[in-house]
From Swiss-Prot:
GO cellular component, one term: beta-galactosidase complex
Signal peptide range: none
Alphabetized UniProt keyword annotations: Glycosidase, Hydrolase, Magnesium, Metal-binding, Sodium
The organism of origin for this protein: Escherichia coli (strain SMS-3-5 / SECEC)
Binding site for Mg(2+) 2: N598
Gene3D superfamilies: 2.70.98.10, Galactose-binding domain-like (2.60.120.260), Glycosidases (3.20.20.80), Immunoglobulins (2.60.40.10)
Chain residues that bind Mg(2+) 1: E417, H419, E462
SUPFAM superfamilies: (Trans)glycosidases, beta-Galactosidase/glucuronidase domain, Galactose mutarotase-like, Galactose-binding domain-like
Residue numbers marked as site, Transition state stabilizer: H358, H392
Taxonomy of the source species: Bacteria, Pseudomonadati, Pseudomonadota, Gammaproteobacteria, Enterobacterales
Enzyme class: hydrolase
Quaternary structure, from the entry: Homotetramer.
Protein name: Beta-galactosidase
Reaction(s) catalysed by this chain's protein: Hydrolysis of terminal non-reducing beta-D-galactose residues in beta-D-galactosides
GO MF term set: beta-galactosidase activity; carbohydrate binding; magnesium ion binding
Length: 1024
């Protein structure tokens, strides 16, 4: 044990937090979760241990701008003005200094290993009583599961130790410091340390004791470590459980270890052995270690699909059988290996349906509770995810247990990121930083290696490629050859990774960056000598209204076996709750706390909002990742299962046929598909519709029974096909009254019964409509070529740093947002049975014509207004965001009814999950509340839209809400939006895709850009 004076002054003088060679003082070695049961049955059933005591709760807290401001007296007694905070928590969430959101740029001046003199410091203290029997014998430890960034610990005024690495436990022996009765802990937490240079992840920078604190009482002679691993024969019919157990203490020669393996209430295998029997080399063996091997016949294998778990109980006892201590862990029999360029799980090539997940809570910052963790896992499973990357640090210990039990594959990632360094490997190639990096990798492995869910180790994130990575890669491969190692830094295919693991590589497009080219994922596989599998560590940047082009990745994954999936960036928006002057909550992002530097809304890249409400993009991910694929041939549906191990034992296939949303026939049958097999389902003779319309066959896979992660009735997969339809010929209708045209100097006015249409001759726009005396429009019907910019449209562009390549900057520079309209034509003609208004407009900026729009409005005797639009786009203007019409309707109706794709928001490059049907939703549900307002709520493939007294028919896309595109463009946060008068309607003949390969470069694929020179669309507007 390192001895140091208890004086605070000496601690401050040492400045351990500015020395990369000092990562800890007196911290105990890393190990798996301990509970120190004194009863084997309690260990087997994972009951709460009497030897484990939580110290979570209210602690005294005082904040100081720097450690030098902390008074020496605080070591012995609470300060009179100390506050109370809950542990675990981030002190920024309690009003002490501010959270900082930055992606790449360090939040402090870069001068490693030194940190600013103004280093916010939190002083925590807790007074507690200790169980006196704990003082009489044994060892009492204190465990801090997570403290950011570094801390010194005192107990009863005496210095205990020091720790850093905010995402792994720091554990200390308190035995020599405790006394009978009351005891006082004092923890001085520093916001910044040299460790902060290794923790430059894209997240909020927060501080404090943000994970659990607990006391653990162990016997003097104790289990100090244990490691389990599973080995198999070729066909997985026989397995061996290897358990390596290490002890410390006395009576070594008289001790025995028993390892028993349980499956529920049944003991499967057991073995007992003394210590020191295994020869390691010519000098002998470890006197304090032993390895037991238990044979298991026909083991129930673990996978994310079927997470079969056993329970291993490790008992330390005397030769006569007296139990000293028991530890235990869940065991999953599974094998991970790479063979012939494929990542195999239990001999099968696994397709990673993955997502990156930050530990984030909108109210609690980086504090994770079990309820939130379970909620995340259930949502992931329900949306067909099978894997999660712990981005970019080891997670709360409970997370891994839950992943074991519910079934998720885990990439466990070391808490190392130096993204803001120039070059990025400045520290990771420096041997002076190897000890700090080594602690972060080795301790992660030692803590988490018993978890079957952990199938891949990661050396960290965005830290370049340095010699330290190579050393740590070799260490892991030596200590744990049972798992592959991945690391993206330095080009995603260095010697420090077993898997090609690029981020944001595109399907077909090379990005030939200097030094670290990012090849298309298809090309990467074919590079000379490249035999590794490719799994994208990050892809499909889900920032705001995004995930366009996701289907293209999944087409490639299914086409090329060595393209084994990837991890979407990312799971949850990292917005935080603030409150306005009236106490109303609102969602904040970078800069909203006065934090500098900041990267604005770049913290919100989630498939779910911070409160775990799904984004519409989540449904697209669910559909593309579904485990059942379908093919229709005649009346036969071929169902292919992509499950590797699971037979479809809880699935019904429901099919239905509908004509323009009207059900014609349906049926249901059980699915009986073996893993990686097919089932042919013959449908009955389908009804022939008597009328015309779109005829669709829809299939859903429904789980009739509840599972551990879903309720009864959960839909896991679906598909639609458009069937052959009857052709129709428009027959002449019975004569109607002929609309009457009235011409004045200002207007053309058409009247039919109680309806009137007014066209302003000076503007050429439909300026008003009446039903009776009620006006229908608040603004004229106009062309629209813009959208409120998406995050993907903005990219990295900002007011002080313009990116001219961003879509929004191209549109601005070309004048799309500032275009003024010039009337070219506005005429009226009386036809035999209708009135025809013909208009032409030029949309211009600084004397240059960007668009010419020619329209005809044909109002017939039935009251229908048929609108035909032809648009010419200048060849040298950027491709527009949309080609459509917009107006502000006077009515605010409660519901919107449409025949088209839905029910969720969908866009041309993100619509495979949408289904064609007749949908009916509240108006409020047509708006997607992205925290940073943008274009939202589009519904594509629409044949009919009904709202209030109005109906629109044609083939178009639309969005409808209380917010104009102008307001969405000008508003920084969703809570600042105000419902405008009436309802804004946008009807598009054509709409550009949204992109999503990344959010900092134009990523809309060419096929989803509006690159043609001419566009034509039609629609009919009438009153119901």
């Amino acid at each position: 044990m390192t001895m140091i004076t208890d004086s605070l002054a000496v601690v401050l003088q040492r400045r351990d937090w500015e020395n990369p060679g000092v990562t800890q003082l007196n911290r105990l070695a890393a190990h798996p979760h301990f509970a120190s049961w004194r009863n084997s049955e309690e260990a087997r059933t994972d009951r709460p241990s009497q030897q484990l005591r939580s110290l979570n709760g209210e602690w005294r807290f005082a904040w100081f701008p720097a450690p030098e401001a902390v008074p020496e007296s605080w070591l012995d007694c609470d300060l009179p003005d100390a506050d109370t905070v809950v542990v675990p928590s981030n002190w920024q969430m309690h009003g002490y200094d501010a959270p900082i959101y930055t992606n790449v740029t360090y939040p402090i001046t870069v001068n490693p290993p030194f940190v600013p003199a103004e280093n916010p410091t939190g002083c925590y203290s807790l007074t507690f009583n200790i169980d006196e029997c704990w003082l009489q014998k044994g060892q009492t430890r204190i465990i801090f599961d997570g403290v950011n960034s570094a801390f010194h610990l005192w107990c009863n005024g005496r210095w205990v130790g020091y720790g850093q690495d905010s995402r792994l436990p720091s554990e200390f022996d308190l035995s020599a410091f405790l006394r009978a009765g009351k005891n006082r802990l004092a923890v001085m937490v520093l916001r910044w340390s040299d460790g902060s240079y290794l923790e430059d992840q894209d997240m909020w920078r927060m501080s404090g004791i943000f994970r659990d604190v607990s006391l653990l009482h162990k016997p003097t002679t104790q289990i100090s470590d244990f490691h389990v691993a599973t080995r198999f024969n070729d066909d997985f019919s026989r397995a061996v459980l290897e358990a390596e157990v290490q002890m410390c203490g006395e009576l070594r020669d008289e001790l025995r270890v028993t390892v028993s393996l349980w499956q529920g209430e049944t003991q499967v295998a057991s073995g007992t052995t003394p210590f020191g029997g295994e020869i390691i080399d010519e000098r002998g063996g470890y006197a304090d270690r032993v390895t037991l091997r238990l044979n298991v016949e026909n083991p129930a294998l673990w996978s994310a699909e079927i997470p079969n778990l056993y329970r291993a109980v490790v008992e330390l006892h005397t030769a006569d059988g007296t139990l000293i201590e028991a530890e235990a862990c869940d065991v999953g029999f599974r094998e991970v290996r790479i063979e012939n360029g494929l990542l195999l799980l239990n001999g099968k090539p696994v397709l990673i349906r993955g997502v990156n997940r930050h530990e984030h809570h909108p109210l609690h910052g980086q504090v994770m509770d079990e309820q939130t963790m379970v909620q995340d896992i259930l949502l992931m499973k329900q949306n067909n995810f099978n894997a999660v990357r712990c981005s970019h640090y080891p997670n709360h210990p409970l997370w891994y247990t839950l992943c074991d039990r519910y079934g998720l594959y885990v990439v466990d990632e070391a808490n190392i990121e130096t993204h803001g360094m120039v070059p990025m490997n400045r520290l990771t190639d420096d041997p002076r930083w190897l000890p700090a990096m080594s602690e972060r990798v080795t301790r992660m492995v030692q803590r988490d290696r018993n978890h079957p869910s952990v199938i891949i180790w990661s050396l960290g994130n965005e830290s370049g490629h340095g010699a330290n990575h190579d050393a740590l890669y070799r260490w892991i491969k030596s200590v744990d050859p049972s798992r592959p190692v991945q690391y993206e830094g330095g080009g995603a295919d260095t010697t420090a990774t077993d898997i090609i693991c690029p981020m944001y590589a595109r399907v077909d497009e090379d990005q030939p960056f200097p030094a670290v080219p990012k090849w298309s994922i298809k090309k990467w596989l074919s590079l000379p000598g490249e035999l590794r599998p490719l799994i994208l560590c990050e892809y499909a940047h889900a920032m705001g209204n995004s995930l366009g082009g996701f289907a293209k990745y999944w087409q490639a994954f299914r086409q090329y076996p060595r393209l084994q999936g990837g991890f979407v960036w990312d799971w949850v928006d990292q917005s935080l709750i603030k409150y306005d002057e009236n106490g109303n909550p609102w969602s904040a992002y970078g800069g909203d706390f006065g934090d500098t530097p900041n990267d604005r809304q770049f913290c919100m890249n989630g498939l779910v909002f911070a409160d775990r409400t799904p984004h519409p993009a989540l449904t697209e991910a669910k559909h593309q990742q579904q485990f059942f694929q379908f093919r229709l041939s005649g009346r036969t549906i071929e169902v292919t299962s992509e499950y590797l191990f699971r037979h479809s034992d809880n699935e019904l296939l429901h099919w239905s046929v509908a004509l323009d949303g009207k059900p014609l026939a349906s049926g249901e049958m059980p699915l009986d598909v073996a893993p990686q097999d097919k089932q042919l389902i013959e449908l009955p003779e389908l009804p022939q519709p008597e009328s015309t319309g779109q005829l669709w066959l829809t299939v859903h896979v429904v789980q009739p029974n509840a599972t551990a992660w879903s309720e009864a009735g959960h839909i896991s997969a679906w598909q639609q096909w458009r069937l052959a339809e009857n052709l129709s010929v428009a027959l002449p209708s019975a004569p109607h009254a002929i609309p009457q045209l009235t011409t004045s100097e200002m207007d053309f006015c058409i009247e039919l019964g109680n309806k009137r249409w007014q066209f302003n001759r000076q503007s050429g726009f439909l300026s008003q409509m009446w039903i009776g005396d009620e006006k229908q429009l608040l603004t004229p019907l106009r062309d629209q070529f813009i959208r409120a910019p998406l995050d993907n449209d903005i990219g990295v562009s900002e007011a002080t740093r313009i990116d001219p390549n961003a879509w929004v900057e191209r549109w601005k520079a070309a004048g799309h947002y500032q275009a003024e309209v010039a009337l070219l034509q506005c005429t009226a003609d009386i036809l035999a049975d209708a009135v025809l208004i013909t208009t032409a407009h030029a949309w211009q900026h600084q004397g240059k014509t960007l668009f010419i729009s020619r329209k005809t409005y044909r109002i017939d005797g039935s009251g229908q207004m048929a609108i035909t639009v032809d648009v010419e786009v200048a060849s040298d203007t950027p491709h527009p965001a949309r080609i459509g019409l917009t107006c502000q309707l006077a009515q605010v109706a409660e519901r919107v009814n449409w025949l088209g794709l839905g029910p969720q928001e969908n866009y041309p490059d993100r619509l495979t999950a949408a289904c064609f049907d007749r949908w009916d939703l509240p108006l409020s549900d047509m708006y997607t509340p992205y925290v940073f307002p943008s274009e939202n709520g589009l519904r594509c493939g629409t044949r009919e839209l009904n709202y209030g007294p109005h109906q629109w028919r044609g083939d178009f896309q639309f969005n409808i809400s209380r917010y104009s595109q102008q307001q969405l463009m000008e508003t920084s946060h969703r809570h600042l939006l105000h419902a405008e008068e009436g309802t804004w309607l946008n009807i598009d003949g054509f709409h550009m895709g949204i992109g999503g390969d990344d959010s900092w470069s134009p990523s809309v694929s060419a096929e989803f850009q509006l690159s043609a020179g001419r566009y034509h669309y039609q629609l009919v507007w009438c009153q119901k």
